[in-house]
Amino acid sequence: MRRKTAALAAALLLALFPCTALAAPSTSAQAYAVVDGETGRVLFSKNAEEKLPMASTTKVMTCLVALERCSLDEIVTVDPAAAGLEGTSMYLSAGETLTVSDLLYGLMMSSGNDAAAALAYHIAGGIEQFAALMNQKAQEIGAESTHFVNPHGLPAEGHYTTASDLAKIAAYALKNQAFARIVSTKSMDLPADDDSPARYL
């Protein structure tokens, strides 16, 4: 499972930047797609259409959907179902209020599963409803071999993508200036307020 996830993560990273290499990469990855970040042209691939679990690379689509449906200064109240979610976290508390911007930085910089769920409940009222929005966006992008079940990437039946689709999603997301800014941020301090502690991401 870890090797499959790493392969898809590699595909995402390779999609983020223009690639001028002339030799196929030397890797043990089960699947990959090396694309030119400017043109979208596939340079090299291996098992690029194989459906695999996508783990935290799920959050690329979560971030994209949130950016297209919310303003960054919109206030989110953390749903109890999002607080304390297993796995990587930005340590949200039920009832805490943060901006969409804060949650997106926690989502992408801390890989916060709780941030993903908090955004899902805020935007769509639930995990299943938000996953439907993610699947709708995937179809719009042309990622036809991708299916989302949740916004965070925790293991779930029917939650999968391909290296090829992941590259398409990443390339599309990077056209969004806010997304590009978030994923290029190295560190961030979120100051404390009345009901939220200070956080360092």
Task: Give, region by region, the residue ranges found by the protein language model.
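Active-site helix/loop module of the DD-peptidase/beta-lactamase fold
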Residues: 80-94, 134-147
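Short, well-structured active-site flanking segments
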Residues: 68-81, 177-185
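Soluble non-cytosolic domains of exported or imported proteins
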Residues: 51-57, 94-101, 109-113, 124-132, ...
